[in-house]
Amino acid sequence: MGLFAEYGVSGRLTLQLKADWQDGEDAFVDYSGRGPIEIGATWQVWRDDRNAVSLYGGYTQAGEGRNAGYAAPGVGDHDWEARVSVGRSLGPMGERWGMDGAFVELQAARRLRDGLPDETRIDATAGARIGEDWMVLGQAFGGAADGGARWLSLEASVVRDFGAWSMQAGWRQTVAGQGIPISRGPVLAIWRRF
């Protein structure tokens, strides 16, 4: 179970917090405990009517659970991450298919890790609103640890708005990789805007 919180300090600066509790088992070990806790900030560097570019910097303190999908539980100490995100509104293109607010986003990150190999990550998202209260999302999460594990997970989900609250339901699955466990399962989330 995880927690993700984001707070807009200003129109261009947001603060983030990520934390989770892990309870898992694989062929070699059962584990339960606090996962990594990450704090960070995102600065919107540039924006126009259809495009946006932002930079993220974050720090992660490792936990007792898996701090990396390819490492044993509890391995690793702390991480630093730098990330750039580029997003684009598809404007009228999405409207032709009955979607409003269609967008794509690409993120590239470098994670410097203490006690684990450094990582390069690439994440991509495509999404669109369907009507006033629904959104569909397709996401890909890929990465490579220096000299080791590689992974690609895909996620498809729908989000339903209920005023300031939203519920997300979907499925995430590892579709390719090397030196990592294959994972798959439901994605359930509750969002609150304030």
Regions found by a protein language model. Give the residues of each.
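Transmembrane beta-barrel domains of Gram-negative outer membranes and organellar outer membranes
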Residues: 1-114, 118-121, 128-193
